[in-house]
Amino acid sequence: MKIVTVNDYDEMSKFAAKIIASQIILKENSVLGLATGGTPLGMYKELINLYNKENLNFSKVQTFNLDEYYGVSDDNPQSYHYYMKNNFFKFTNIKNENINILDGTTSDIENECKSYDNKILSSGGIDIQVLGIGENGHIGFNEPDINFEAKTHLVKLDEKTIEANSRFFNSKNEVPTSALSMGIKTIMQSKKILLLANGEKKAEAIFKMVNGKISPEVPASILQLHNDTTIIIDKAAAKML
């Protein structure tokens, strides 16, 4: 586990974008695992800058998103389909057929999840998986006490996660209570993992992930066992290390 401490959010975002860009330059048909939420927004903005100013080419890149709210349609502004399109995809030359995001409106959850895992495998596996971390130590929507052997599945969202995500909605009551998410096993099969965190609110989760015992109570602690994980955090998130 490599830890990179930077000064602030902007530096974190640019550092992460450079790692992603280097991967794409090295392998033009790279497979990227992508995350949503507030943390990676700056990274996406910087990748768009690299596309516009340095001709970073996304035309052969494949992407798989970590998760999607269950019961939320693609065109809903709160969906992660909408987030990815409007914060990243539509500003690059990535091809629609290379974009993979779980279907939150599926009537066959088991098949949707199984097909997603199979498509990741058939693509050759994820080259770099981008992660954030929740205040409760979740990665993706893998909440505390998750089964480390779980693949992509339906999860019930933790109360802390619902509270944290309520800032994106008009009220807490509008936040979905479940989601489809890559499982820990799916995430751990990624060749490289890039975890981003900023702010003092994430400091305790970062400490437990890095220095705590490996336990389902802190899902991110499993990353101690991954052989190529880079943690990029600002000084505030690193304050307990």
Swiss-Prot record:
Function comment: Catalyzes the reversible isomerization-deamination of glucosamine 6-phosphate (GlcN6P) to form fructose 6-phosphate (Fru6P) and ammonium ion.
Catalytic activity: alpha-D-glucosamine 6-phosphate + H2O = beta-D-fructose 6-phosphate + NH4(+)
Catalytic residues identified in the record: 67 (proton acceptor), 136 (for ring-opening step), 138 (proton acceptor), 143 (for ring-opening step)
Origin organism lineage: Bacteria, Bacillati, Bacillota, Clostridia, Eubacteriales
Record-level GO BP terms: carbohydrate metabolic process; glucosamine catabolic process; N-acetylglucosamine catabolic process; N-acetylneuraminate catabolic process
EC number(s) per entry: 3.5.99.6
PANTHER family recorded: GLUCOSAMINE-6-PHOSPHATE ISOMERASE
One GO term describing the cellular component: cytoplasm
PROSITE patterns referenced in this protein's UniProt entry, alphabetically: GLC_GALNAC_ISOMERASE
Keyword field: Carbohydrate metabolism, Hydrolase
Protein's pathway: Amino-sugar metabolism; N-acetylneuraminate degradation; D-fructose 6-phosphate from N-acetylneuraminate: step 5/5
Gene Ontology MF, one: identical protein binding
Gene3D superfamilies in alphabetical order: 3.40.50.1360
InterPro entries: Glc/Gal-6P_isomerase (IPR006148), Glucosamine6P_isomerase (IPR004547), Glucosamine6P_isomerase_CS (IPR018321), NagB/RpiA_transferase-like (IPR037171)
Protein family: Belongs to the glucosamine/galactosamine-6-phosphate isomerase family. NagB subfamily.
Protein name per the record: Glucosamine-6-phosphate deaminase
SUPFAM superfamilies referenced in this protein's UniProt entry, alphabetically: NagB/RpiA/CoA transferase-like
NCBIfam families, alphabetized: nagB, PRK00443.1-4
